[in-house]
Curated annotation (Swiss-Prot):
The gene is Cht2. This is Probable chitinase 2. It catalyses: Random endo-hydrolysis of N-acetyl-beta-D-glucosaminide (1->4)-beta-linkages in chitin and chitodextrins. GO terms for biological process: chitin catabolic process; chitin-based cuticle development; chitin-based embryonic cuticle biosynthetic process; ecdysis, chitin-based cuticle; larval chitin-based cuticle development; polysaccharide catabolic process; regulation of tube size, open tracheal system; wound healing. Residues 1-33 form the signal peptide. InterPro entries: Chitinase_II/V-like_cat (IPR011583), Chitinase_insertion_sf (IPR029070), Glyco_hydro18_cat (IPR001223), Glyco_hydro_18_chit_AS (IPR001579), Glycoside_hydrolase_SF (IPR017853), Glycosyl_Hydrlase_18 (IPR050314). The modification Phosphoserine is found at S467. It comes from Drosophila melanogaster (Fruit fly).
Amino acid sequence: MTLRSRLSGEAPQLWLLLLLASTASSLWASVAARTGPLHDKVVVCYVSTWAVYRPEQGAYAIENFDPNLCTHVVYAFAGLDITQAAIKSLDPWQDLKEEYGKGGYEKMTGLKRSHPHLKVSLAIGGWNEGSANYSTLVANNLLRGRFVKQVSSFIRKYNFDGLDLDWEYPTQRKGKPADRENFVLLTKELREEFDEHGLLLTSAIGASKKVIDEAYDVRQISRYLDYLHIMCYDYHGSWDRRVGYNAPLTAPADDPLSVKFSIDYLLKLGAPPEKLVMGLPFYGRTFKTLASGFLNDVSEGVGFKGPYTREDGFLGYNEICQTLSNQTSGWTREWDPQTSQVLAKSERNVFTQEINVVTYDSSRSIANKVLFAMSKRLAGVMVWSVDTDDFLGNCKLDEDTYEDFQKVTAAPKRSSQNYPLLRTINEATMLAVDELAVPEPQPDDSENEIPHGSIADRKNAGASMVSLGLGVTAVFMLLHRLAQ
């Protein structure tokens, strides 16, 4: 055989080798470029944007946010201009770039360029917005229609992926009985508009039985919402005038104030599990008492405030863990296995005779709740809010996080100490698969659509990684055979 004929015979093989090498390179690049959690569950992270104004180490800017720990982030909050039936920024200097503002909207949505897995929504409402204006809006067909078009345009103008409705709550706090039905109309009309542009539609949902019964037609709103973010916290606080747990996982059978009751009740009312996102608090509720500082002790007035959040009756997890980390502070803590809650209390003040108490979720609480959410086949969990996690990593990590997991002998090693609660969520989500050892069911789509931008486009990310790995292996095996 001549040299020329030999080369011409090898040319197709050479081109095939080059093609396969290019394919292998692309596959490895896909693996390397993956961002976000290494599981297929939803982790929704609310950011309270006023946290930027907190003092010292409590100040939280968008630059502090770690997009790899969340699948969705919700920028909280925008407000309602009822005179225009329009969404509006509540802090133009912080949110917008106009008038030399800081451009918070653009900074948050800009994270998608380097983290393509991330979905960024804008929340409208919140506790301070109240309910009256939203009640007026949804009761009027003209106002409702104007709002639907304007909010769709606003969301797209600032490059958000969707809207989170945080009306607290329909029919409550100067709302009207008709709000329950009118809220369904609002979600339906937003769904129709948002489908034209591929936008997400979610809503924060109250967790108490009273609010659920009076405010929501659960089965109907589930048809139009991609996800229902259940606010499974604030079950108890200083407003009760006695010490209580902020977010107990379970409670006595006749007590509806628990996470388990809220989730089970919503499922009973027809909420699809693949649309339910269970809320986890990155904060505790505080109390002052003249008694001994135990559960159900009578409390005095509003709870004490922290140095960063500076809110009566409220303490961020970062404030709690720093307080408890001080060995000379005189604080003690006690774990309640029935509720997966921690109660911590100070020494008695010699002047006021009061004891300060805080009830909160530790890493162990979070892990147990994630396990519960996975056992119920929920879409995932959400957090309020990432800015009160120990985002700087100032505190020592808990050593009992997986104490209640049967198949975990040691906590996974972490590369970083920051965001201990958020990292626990992602660890526990993956560990729960082995703990429960039950195959995932296929969602029932007979009545509810596949969530937009959620289940359909995040189907088993772990399996995708395995497929990529197998693809790369196959390519290199073929390359090896051709080279022989």
